[in-house]
């Protein structure tokens, strides 16, 4: 019985790139290779406009499951490779059609003749291939407008690809082509989604989390580690910086009027994150802010908070409502982790009436009464850094180390 031997990957947005296209293709190939480490028999060939993954006996469903999370892939097809002879093409088309799962009642044939010297024209091939499928199946009809299955045939010199099963990729651009950002990862619903959407634009992320023991628990810290771990499904690794924030928060609570404590806290977070960004050669800061969602996310608040950093602040969720954000969180697997009931540092010192229209002048005047620089230095110096990779990759590396 014929089985799928190849997966053909289409790039999508990457095809609009000019001189940098080879870099994008190379990065995507590297990311796919990393994602498919578990499958040693696979061979990957990336051309200018498509990627060919030769399965060599590996499970196509298991490989497909991992491919769907790789940014830079628009769509991919499970494919069979047959000699460019009419009888072989007919047999391959039938075999591919029979492997399609689900309630299939209609189909159509699409033929692309890359090899123009093939002895039959497209309009001659359609009834030959379609007729062979009809002769060898029951209760199946042709529907050229809205078929359940599109049997695609690509004819080349010497061989042809037969494809039925088309699947959607993650879209976007390959992670790594767009530089690096620091993302503020709170442990809530929004910030992991912001990290995901940033990666979708080809940007590598490192996460910064502020925790305030004993006011925040080890479980709250573990929750953030688990979120960062979940995000590794979409990239090679996530570096997580855990910043001790207790002394900064206690000082803000003591020295700053309560209405401005939230604003000043966010400004301190920006200052610390900027320092880490400089150390790590990051080019921007990403946050999970959504306009008007809470008091610290008004335009006035953002204007006042932005003052303390020269780095671009990327806010992927800025115009989304909460339901839109939750939907993405559920799709990417972070929602159930985010709703674990453990407080983060943003909630333990929440003022009763935070200013919704804070002014830069006031924030600067309040901050000038106390020298926060030593506390910022201490927080940066005492941060804990860990590098997280997908569980499977870690398991493979541990297995390799056990051999020595």
Curated annotation (Swiss-Prot):
It comes from the Bacteria. One of its GO terms (cellular component) is cytosol. Keywords: ATP-binding, Cytoplasm, Nucleotide-binding, RNA-binding, Thiamine biosynthesis, Transferase, tRNA-binding. Disulfide bonds: none annotated. It catalyses: [ThiI sulfur-carrier protein]-S-sulfanyl-L-cysteine + a uridine in tRNA + 2 reduced [2Fe-2S]-[ferredoxin] + ATP + H(+) = [ThiI sulfur-carrier protein]-L-cysteine + a 4-thiouridine in tRNA + 2 oxidized [2Fe-2S]-[ferredoxin] + AMP + diphosphate; [ThiS sulfur-carrier protein]-C-terminal Gly-Gly-AMP + S-sulfanyl-L-cysteinyl-[cysteine desulfurase] + AH2 = [ThiS sulfur-carrier protein]-C-terminal-Gly-aminoethanethioate + L-cysteinyl-[cysteine desulfurase] + A + AMP + 2 H(+). Catalyzes the ATP-dependent transfer of a sulfur to tRNA to produce 4-thiouridine in position 8 of tRNAs, which functions as a near-UV photosensor. Also catalyzes the transfer of sulfur to the sulfur carrier protein ThiS, forming ThiS-thiocarboxylate. This is a step in the synthesis of thiazole, in the thiamine biosynthesis pathway. The sulfur is donated as persulfide by IscS. PANTHER family: TRNA SULFURTRANSFERASE. This is Probable tRNA sulfurtransferase. The gene is thiI.
